[in-house]
């Protein structure tokens, strides 16, 4: 078990100078590892995605981020998506290719 799985880490995202509502989000990878992010409700989720990918050492376009089964786009904010404290974002490996079997 890696350190990351043993104790979830957290990262603070957003502008600390301004007031604002923050929530803690859990980002769970396919390997069940958790990283916690504290984000401002109006922060574009691109920041969270970039930070997660940097920690994992993978390019951002190689992963897909989902909230309640829907893909998260870079310009969306937690407020737009109706996210609440401790909500979960799932991360999956991007899959391309394949063909129809019809």
Swiss-Prot record:
Residues 99-102 form a propeptide. Ubiquitin-like protein that can be covalently attached to proteins as a monomer or a lysine-linked polymer. Covalent attachment via an isopeptide bond to its substrates requires prior activation by the E1 complex sae1-sae2 and linkage to the E2 enzyme ube2i. This post-translational modification on lysine residues of proteins plays a crucial role in a number of cellular processes such as nuclear transport, DNA replication and repair, mitosis and signal transduction. GO terms for molecular function: protein tag activity; transcription factor binding; ubiquitin-like protein ligase binding. Belongs to the ubiquitin family. SUMO subfamily. This is Small ubiquitin-related modifier 1-B. SUPFAM superfamilies: Ubiquitin-like (SSF54236). GO terms for cellular component: cytoplasm; nuclear membrane; nuclear speck; nucleus; plasma membrane; PML body. Residues 21-98 form the Ubiquitin-like domain. Keywords: Cell membrane, Cytoplasm, Isopeptide bond, Membrane, Nucleus, Ubl conjugation pathway. InterPro entries: Rad60/SUMO-like_dom, SUMO1_Ubl, Ubiquitin-like_dom, Ubiquitin-like_domsf. It comes from Xenopus laevis. One of its GO terms (biological process) is protein sumoylation. Interacts with sae2, ube2i, ranbp2, pias1 and pias2. Interacts with sox9 and sox10. Covalently attached to a number of proteins. PANTHER family: SMALL UBIQUITIN-RELATED MODIFIER. It is found in: Nucleus membrane; Nucleus speckle; Cytoplasm; Nucleus, PML body. Cleavage of precursor form by a sentrin-specific protease is necessary for function.
